[in-house]
């Protein structure tokens, strides 16, 4: 096998591979000899089938396997001898002349083919110890705990029927049956019986609750509303619906009491324990936001410290994924690029930059993780899978089988776990300076940072444990 490099431009490489006819013949003969003792053909004793006969019967199919094995060997040889890492699967280009291929399959001519590769960039990791990051931290105020307790008390207070003939007011609860229709046809999910609706909670479609103000028990009303353009169920978005509503009861809220009895409804023994649990929960929310902010700052710092060529196809794939999200978001909201104060051309330029950032950060984090020998234990992946299954009640077995049979899907579960471990590792190398801030300041930049959630690397899948993750695809 003769391998010659014919192109080296950036991360694109091409090699010409030549398999001599004599080598093809030798490989075929070896395969046929091995087949002789295994095959059973009518009219021949086991192990006594002439090789020439085997060649007439199986020669072409075995030669196809010989060629495929040779292609795989050539790919491996190219990668090992040139110390290359693939960004994508190699592209193999066989001769266009079918007669030439036919001769090679008969071992009467050399087989020449091209191997085109897109490879990973090589770069050195920089010293991260000179990075200084500010970590904003916020404390839970007593007023926030009190407000949370008030909400919990209001959500758990009892309701009692108003006097006969009483009209429903804001804050009351109405018990209703309803049937919804679009263009005169009942639609899925548009009907319910004995549904509790707290007037003023804004939990139903905008305008629905307002049309029940003043209603009395036993009254029937027709409610007409229009589903928002961004309604999750696309088949309903923007459509007008008419609901036939029967008001079965009008109930007034009881007093919202914050005491030990409230704590017991949440499985805690006292109000003090409930306050402690609420404070812990609110603190966890603030800690998570603080983590997001410092992680964003770290990724910004890493992005500014690394500059290397990016695999064009990986960037294109990442851009396509991000752009699809952007277009779907605009469509669901009924908006255009002009509505967002930009043009499609400008937006594409910005999101292409974001795609490049994601690929770059994915590659950097992958190399950091590889150099630090960071692994994700199977137990953690299993926990992530269990959490995923809980999102599909009633379909757990179906989703479980999908993940277990789909290595790519499992890699997507593992990738963010790997990234968080790598981020923790790098945060241990940098200098962190804590800065006390208010809760409002902690969340102030949330909207900008979320842009399309594409400014971070997690969805780029940085991990050295699978090819997909390594490529940050």
Swiss-Prot record:
**Which reactions is this enzyme annotated as catalysing?**
[protein]-peptidylproline (omega=180) = [protein]-peptidylproline (omega=0)
Establish whether keyword Plastid is in the entry: no
Q: What is the lineage of its organism?
A: Bacteria, Pseudomonadati, Pseudomonadota, Alphaproteobacteria, Hyphomicrobiales
Gene3D superfamilies the record matches: 3.10.50.40, Trigger factor ribosome-binding domain, Trigger factor, C-terminal domain
NCBIfam families in UniProt: tig
Entries under Pfam families matching the protein: FKBP_C, Trigger_C, Trigger_N
Its subcellular locations are: Cytoplasm
Enzyme class comes to isomerase
Q: Which residue ranges does the record assign to the PPIase FKBP-type domain?
A: 171-256
Q: What species is given as this protein's source?
A: Methylobacterium nodulans (strain LMG 21967 / CNCM I-2342 / ORS 2060)
Please identify the protein, giving its name as recorded.
Answer: Trigger factor
Q: What does this protein do?
A: Involved in protein export. Acts as a chaperone by maintaining the newly synthesized protein in an open conformation. Functions as a peptidyl-prolyl cis-trans isomerase.
